[in-house]
């Protein structure tokens, strides 16, 4: 997979090198259209309920929650789990070796990302 995809140009480059999935820190209408037509699975970034709802309207059910440390950390994800029970998240941004297990313990978290892994 490839991360921090933020433009149609990057989506095309990712497609040309044969990636299996893409991750973006955010989403807008232009990127949504490009992701949807690329044929490559992707995880769009969200931070707010409005962004989650817009993604759900696209038929998406898995999102990157970014930056987690600035948008409510575990509290936000717990609340989103109650409001959006069918939605899954991969939180990134401020996740550490010390905190990642707390995130992974949540039912709506399928993975985490963090720079400590590098």
Indicate where each model-derived feature is located.
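Catalytic beta/alpha-barrel core
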Residues: 1-6, 11, 18-27, 41-48, ...
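Glycine-rich beta-strand-to-loop/alpha-helix junction loops that act as flexible
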Residues: 2-3, 91-95, 112-115
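Catalytic cores of alpha/beta
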Residues: 7-20, 50-58, 75, 81-82, ...
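Glycine-rich phosphate-binding active-site loops on the catalytic face of alpha/beta enzymes
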Residues: 25-31, 64-74, 108-118
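A generic structural signal for well-ordered alpha-helical segments
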Residues: 34-35
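Short acidic, glycine/proline-enriched helix-loop-strand junctions
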Residues: 38-42, 84-87
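Short Gly/Pro-enriched loop/turn and capping motifs at secondary-structure junctions
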Residues: 70-71, 86, 95-98, 118
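A short pocket-lining beta-strand/turn micro-motif at the edge of beta-sheets
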Residues: 87-88, 108
């Amino acid at each position: 997979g490839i991360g921090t995809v933020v433009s149609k140009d990057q989506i095309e480059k990712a497609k040309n090198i044969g990636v299996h999935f893409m991750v973006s820190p955010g989403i807008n209408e232009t990127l949504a259209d490009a992701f949807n037509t690329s044929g490559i699975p992707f995880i769009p970034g969200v931070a707010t309920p409005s962004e989650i709802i817009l993604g759900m309207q696209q038929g998406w059910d898995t999102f990157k929650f970014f930056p987690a440390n600035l948008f409510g950390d575990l509290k936000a994800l717990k609340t989103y789990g109650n409001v959006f029970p069918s939605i899954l998240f991969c939180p990134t941004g401020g996740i550490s070796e010390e905190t990642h297990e707390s995130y992974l313990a949540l039912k709506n978290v399928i993975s985490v990302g963090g720079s400590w892994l590098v």
